[in-house]
Structures are given as C-alpha cells and as structure tokens.
Amino acid sequence: MREHRPIIALDFPSFEVVKEFLALFPAEESLYLKVGMELYYAAGPEIVSYLKGLGHSVFLDLKLHDIPNTVKSAMKILSQLGVDMTNVHAAGGVEMMKAAREGLGSQAKLIAVTQLTSTSEAQMQEFQNIQTSLQESVIHYAKKTAEAGLDGVVCSAQEVQVIKQATNPDFICLTPGIRPAGVAVGDQKRVMTPADAYQIGSDYIVVGRPITQAEDPVAAYHAIKDEWTQDWN
C-alpha cells in the first residue's frame, strides 16, 4: 500500500537540530521521518525512541552490509527500537538478506538498496566492475531481494515500472531523489518530481533538502505532499 506522507530525510548533525526542526510542525501532525547514518551515529538509538514517542513513523536508513550472522544480530536490536522500516544493501547477497529478515521479524518493513541514486551507469561499470546497464543491475538486485523475502527496494523512480514487472505489483518501491520542479538536484544523479513519481508507480518517496532547507519547511512539506497525493482516489 502506498504511503501518503512523503518521508522527510532528517539529514541533520545533532539531536538538538532535529528538535528545532520538528518544533516547526504542529504537535498533532504525524510525520514519516528518515534517520540516516549521520544522525544515528550522532544521536544514537535514543533518536528513534524520541521520534516514536512523538507519534512519528521512522525509516532507519543504515544500509547494513556484513556477514549474515552479524546483520541478523543487528536487526534483532533494531526490531526492539520499534522502527517502521529499515534497509540493507542487496549486494550483501540473498543469505544476508534472509538473515536480516529473520532478525528483524515481521513487525517492520525491510527493503534493500539496489544502486544508490548518486551512482551513474559509468561509475557503476568502472568502480563496481559490473558490465551491464544500470537498469539491468537494478532489476537483478530487485529479483534477488524478492527471492530473499524482503518487502521491496530503494530505487530511482525511473526504475519503478520495470522492477514491479520483474517482481510483483505489491513489491515496494521507495524512491529517494525526489525534487519539486525548479529545485536544484544536488548530488542525486537520477531525480523526479513528486507528481511524476506517483504517475510512474512509486510507493514511498523520500525528500530531504527541498523541505529541510526551505525558507518555510512546513509549507514546503505540505506542497510536496499535495503534489504527491493530488491524483489519489
């Protein structure tokens, strides 16, 4: 099922900055928030407990990639934090992804990163030594993710349709790199607007700087949310 709330990427360096940012929103508004490496390493597990205590949903974006037993043990800890979604690198392999699923359990969604949206095809071929097209690599990883029993993948919006065709229509496609028209793309190589992401079939979208660095973050969030959901029945 699609998530009507854009996921806000809390790419902040400290707990205090997060508190200041969230204070801009009405206390009763339930948000979907992404905690990435920078914030998690700065604030620790307490940041997840804090956000959950405020009634928000949390996507813990740590992209685990290690031997299966280590990932399984780490996922057991993350399940105790009450995260709503977390992820691994599909490149870790099917056995690692199966171990992650076992460790996390079924209470939270588990997705895999195929290729980072900052990766171009030329970079993939040169540095990863993968001599296929970028799309072929993404589809391969998506199929392996489905085989491992995960809920979906992180992918660019341009790849959503082929991934769902290669797996199944209910396979989650979470799309970062979402930018409203006219906003700078930053370090993302493959970007799309919220409306385009909806039309192409994305289930979740992640938006960072267009909200967090906006002059009015609350207004920016609601404008993006409105664009994302404008054609929903």
Swiss-Prot record:
GO terms for molecular function: orotidine-5'-phosphate decarboxylase activity. Pathway: Pyrimidine metabolism; UMP biosynthesis via de novo pathway; UMP from orotate: step 2/2. Its EC number is 4.1.1.23. The keyword Cell inner membrane does not apply. GO terms for cellular component: cytosol. Transmembrane segments: none annotated. Keywords: Decarboxylase, Lyase, Pyrimidine biosynthesis. Pfam families: OMPdecase. Gene3D superfamilies: Aldolase class I. It comes from the Bacteria. GO terms for biological process: 'de novo' pyrimidine nucleobase biosynthetic process; 'de novo' UMP biosynthetic process. CDD domains: OMP_decarboxylase_like (cd04725). It catalyses: orotidine 5'-phosphate + H(+) = UMP + CO2. Substrate binds at residues 11, 34, 61-70, 117, 179, 188, 208-209. It is an enzyme of class 4 (lyase). Homodimer. Catalyzes the decarboxylation of orotidine 5'-monophosphate (OMP) to uridine 5'-monophosphate (UMP). This is Orotidine 5'-phosphate decarboxylase.
